C-alpha cells in the first residue's frame, strides 16, 4: 500500500522536503494550506501569542508541516532607528530565542513541556539535528547562522568617543554574531520562519479529525535574544504579523478504507 517517496519518479521537491522526507505520501489527497492569525489581539509589547486550529470533519492536519511566521521590528528604546554604533546583534537561532516556552493543548488537554527552556531545546535540535547544508540554507530563515571564531582586527566596529574619551572598539565574539548584526542593519523588518520545536510537531502522524489544537508561545526577555554595546542600547522588540502555516489534506480512498477496516475489528488508539 505504502510507497516510499524516494523510490517515486524524479520531480521537483517542495521546500519543506529538501531536508525532510516523509516516509510515505500515499495518505494525502487534495491538500490545502492556510495561514492563521492569533485568536487574541496583539500589540508591540504583547507577552504571548495564541492560536487555535479549529477541528475539521473531513481534513487531517499534517503536524510536521506546521510553521511559524512573523516579522521583527527593532528600534532604540526611544523609538528611533538603530545605529551602527549601537552594535546590536542577535543570538543564534533568533526566531526561537524570542520565546521562552510553548504550550500545546489537544482537545483541552495539555501535552507539552511546561519548562521555560524552549529556546535551548530549539537551538540544540537545530544544531545537532540538521546537516551543515540545511543549517546554511533552510535554517537561515529562522535566524540560524553558524558561529565561528573571528581574529582581530576584523572583529569589531568603532564607536564614537564618549565624554572626551578616545574611540573604542566593540568586538563580536564570532563571525555569526557579526553577520547577524549586518543583517539587522540592512533588513527591516526581519521576516523569520521556522518549525515549532515541540514533540507533537516532530512526527509524521497526522492529527485526527474533530480534535481542536491550542498553541501558545510566551515571549522571552530582550536580554536573552539580543546583545548591544551596553544594556542601555538593547533594542526595543516588536513582533508583528505572527502567523501559523497549516497544511490540511483529505485522506485517499485506500488510506481511509484501511482505517475503516481496522476499526471494524479493533479499537483505534492515537498517541502524540
Regions found by a protein language model. Give the residues of each.
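Short, low-complexity Pro/Thr/Gly
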Residues: 1-272
Amino acid at each position: 500500500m505504502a510507497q516510499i517517496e524516494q523510490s517515486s519518479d524524479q520531480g521537483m521537491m517542495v521546500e519543506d522536503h529538501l531536508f525532510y522526507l516523509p516516509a510515505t505520501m500515499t495518505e494525502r489527497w487534495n491538500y490545502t494550506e492556510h495561514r492563521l492569525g492569533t485568536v487574541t489581539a496583539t500589540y508591540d509589547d504583547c507577552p504571548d501569542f495564541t492560536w487555535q486550529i479549529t477541528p475539521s470533519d473531513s481534513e487531517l492536519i499534517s503536524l510536521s508541516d506546521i510553521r511559524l511566521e512573523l516579522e521583527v521590528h527593532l528600534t532604540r528604546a526611544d523609538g528611533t532607528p538603530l545605529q551602527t554604533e549601537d552594535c546590536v546583534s542577535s543570538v543564534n537561532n533568533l526566531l526561537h530565542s524570542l520565546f521562552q516556552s510553548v504550550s500545546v493543548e489537544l482537545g483541552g488537554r495539555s501535552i507539552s513541556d511546561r519548562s521555560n527552556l524552549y529556546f535551548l531545546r530549539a537551538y540544540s535540535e537545530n544544531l545537532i539535528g540538521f546537516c551543515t547544508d540545511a543549517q546554511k540554507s533552510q535554517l537561515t530563515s529562522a535566524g540560524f547562522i553558524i558561529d565561528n571564531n573571528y581574529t582581530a582586527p576584523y572583529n569589531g566596529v568603532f564607536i564614537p568617543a564618549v565624554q572626551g574619551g578616545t574611540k573604542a572598539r566593540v568586538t563580536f565574539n564570532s563571525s555569526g554574531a557579526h553577520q547577524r548584526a549586518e543583517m539587522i542593519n540592512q533588513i527591516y523588518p526581519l521576516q523569520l520562519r521556522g518549525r515549532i520545536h515541540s514533540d507533537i510537531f516532530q512526527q509524521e502522524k497526522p492529527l485526527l479529525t474533530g480534535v481542536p489544537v491550542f498553541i501558545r508561545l510566551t515571549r522571552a526577555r530582550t536580554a536573552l535574544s539580543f546583545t548591544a554595546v551596553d544594556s542601555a542600547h538593547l533594542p526595543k522588540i516588536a513582533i508583528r504579523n505572527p502567523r501559523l502555516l497549516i497544511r490540511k489534506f483529505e485522506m485517499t480512498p485506500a488510506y481511509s478504507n484501511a482505517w475503516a477496516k481496522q476499526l471494524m475489528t479493533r479499537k483505534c488508539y492515537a498517541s502524540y
